[in-house]
Structures are given as structure tokens and as C-alpha cells.
């Protein structure tokens, strides 16, 4: 099956032709089977680091230009991997800047890392987001009675392979959990890479417990306690922490996709940067020349800085 190309003005050079934007100093890695590449700028483990996305020779926004659906007929979705399994750096699409590169979250001037709450180390799944979705902070969800968290909808990919930051993978949705994080609705999708050996056996949320016993319980516990070492209370959930089924999850995805579509038509002042390079007729359309300028203005790549050994520290926590 051929990869689905983002809709709109996407100019790809013919095979063998030199890419027209070769002036950009890049470190590229090809994401599996989909034609997406990533472009590193700045220095890893510093505030300057950022990861831009391309499709073919064209810069794109992973938030707005990668289609939500990978294959509508087979109900599979695209996932942008922000944080590979077992890692601690809190990476996420930067929703407030042009092209929405992946950056490490910063809190009080410091790079943010999740703590290792025993027995978990870092993130226990490949973690990321579904593109072309948005949890609207102006929308009060009737399931949680809380507003959205102003981000694309989060997703935990539970397969065996440790993905790479910036991978774009096709996933099958299995279920969803409704985390309430500091008073905001923060949906957590459960999914599996369609190429995972278990994918054929996992079709809904009940199949996770059957074939991966303990995964849902561990996911609930991880989200409940992961902020406690930072001095915050345990997180709470709607539905008493129950993971809802695939049908429910896909309704939530559709709802957040509609919120994203409305966002992309807004022309008022918004903290979200809606720049797109592929969606013709959109008020936020950006030319490739403008996109290249954004990337070249970012710091040039440098050798990665080391991480503090304290990142590997265990934390033993209880929920009060």
C-alpha cells in the first residue's frame, strides 16, 4: 500500500534530482515506509534542540500537515512519536511556533524530565500524538466536566518495538483513558503499531488485558503517580480509571479532529501556531521559502550535551 500524501500543495522532487532546499544543514532520519524525514537543529539535551519534519523535499508541520488517518478503510491512524519508550526527556510538538517542531518541555527555565517512579523507568510506551487533533481549551467535555488541555490528543503505543523520536507510525486504536491533569481533560489513547506481531490479535480494549496482562493497570498507575515526585498530588481519572473501548476512543478522536478543523479556520489571535505548508486555501498557508527560513534561523546542530546522572534516580511514591 502506498503512503498517504498530505493534502494540498506538496511539491516533491523527482528521483535523482537535488532537493531545492539543500542550504539547510540537516541531520535526517527516514521514518519507516512513509517518506517522512526529520531535521535536527540545535543541541540535544539543551533548550536549543528542535526537530523539524519534512515530507519528500518539503517542510511540513507534524501537527497540521500529517493526515490524522493513515488508512480510512482499515481504521488506522498516524501517530507522531515524541517520546520513545524508556526515555525520560519530556518532548512534545511545540504548538506555539511555526512548523511546530518537537522540543523538550521547559519548566521554570529547566529542561523537563519525568521521574522514574519505581518500578517504572521513563515512559513505559512509545508516547506521542495524533496529528490534526486538538483538545480545545474552550470546550467543556461532558465526560470529565473539564476543559481541553490545548494540545493534540495524546497516544500510548504499546507494541514491542522501541520507536525513534520523530517516527510517524500507523497505529490501530484500541481504547482510551480520561486523565484529568491539573483541572484539564487530557485524553490518553491506547494503540498498537499495525506492524507489531500482536496487532492482528488486538482489536479492542479487552484484548489488551487478554494478550498483554497488566498493561492497562500499569498505564493507569503510571499516569496516576508520575507527577508525585515533583510535589504534586496524584492525578485523577474520569470513569474511575476505566479504559473505554475502541468505538468510544474513535468518537473522541473525531471530536478533537473537528476542534482542530475549527482552529485552522480561525484568524483571531491564538496561542496556537497554525502555519501549514500543504493545506491550500487555509488562512495560515506558508510557502516553502518561508518554511526554510524558519528552519535555517534555528541554531545549527551541535554535538549532544550529556544528561545528568540524577535522571536515572528511583522514586518510591505512594498516593495520598
Task: Kindly label every feature range from the protein language model.
Residues 2-320:
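Hydrophobic N-terminal alpha-helices or hydrophobic patches in metabolic proteins across all domains
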Amino acid at each position: 500500500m502506498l503512503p498517504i500524501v498530505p493534502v494540498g500543495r506538496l511539491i516533491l522532487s523527482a528521483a535523482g534530482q537535488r532537493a531545492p532546499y539543500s542550504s539547510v544543514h540537516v541531520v535526517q532520519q527516514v521514518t519507516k515506509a512513509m517518506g517522512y524525514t526529520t531535521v535536527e537543529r540545535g543541541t540535544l539535551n539543551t533548550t536549543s534542540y528542535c526537530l523539524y519534519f519534512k515530507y519528500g523535499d518539503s517542510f511540513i508541520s507534524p501537527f497540521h500537515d500529517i493526515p490524522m488517518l493513515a488508512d480510512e478503510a482499515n481504521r488506522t491512524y498516524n501517530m507522531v512519536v515524541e517520546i520513545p519508550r524508556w526515555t525520560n526527556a519530556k518532548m512534545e510538538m511545540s504548538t506555539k511556533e511555526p512548523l511546530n517542531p518537537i522540543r523538550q518541555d521547559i519548566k521554570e527555565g529547566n529542561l523537563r524530565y519525568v521521574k522514574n517512579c519505581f518500578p517504572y523507568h521513563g515512559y513505559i510506551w512509545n508516547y506521542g500524538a495524533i496529528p490534526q487533533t486538538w483538545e480545545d481549551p474552550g470546550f467543556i467535555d461532558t465526560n470529565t466536566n473539564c476543559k481541553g488541555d490545548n494540545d493534540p490528543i495524546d497516544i500510548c503505543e504499546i507494541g514491542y518495538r522501541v520507536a525513534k523520536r520523530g517516527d510517524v507510525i500507523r497505529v490501530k486504536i484500541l481504547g482510551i483513558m480520561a486523565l484529568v491533569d491539573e483541572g484539564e481533560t487530557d485524553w490518553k489513547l491506547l494503540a498498537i503499531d499495525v506492524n507489531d506481531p500482536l496487532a492482528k490479535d488486538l482489536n479492542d480494549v479487552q484484548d489488551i488485558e487478554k494478550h498483554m496482562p497488566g498493561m492497562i493497570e500499569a498505564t493507569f498507575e503510571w499516569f496516576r503517580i508520575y507527577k508525585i515526585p515533583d510535589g504534586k498530588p496524584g492525578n485523577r481519572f474520569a470513569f474511575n480509571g476505566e479504559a473505554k473501548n475502541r468505538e468510544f476512543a474513535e468518537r473522541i478522536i473525531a471530536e478533537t479532529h473537528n476542534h482542530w478543523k475549527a482552529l485552522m479556520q480561525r484568524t483571531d489571535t491564538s496561542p496556537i501556531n497554525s502555519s501549514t505548508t500543504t493545506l491550500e486555501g487555509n488562512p495560515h498557508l506558508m510557502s516553502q521559502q518561508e518554511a526554510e527560513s524558519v528552519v535555517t534561523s534555528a541554531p545549527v546542530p551541535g554535538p549532544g550535551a550529556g544528561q545528568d546522572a540524577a535522571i536515572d534516580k528511583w522514586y518510591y511514591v505512594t498516593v495520598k
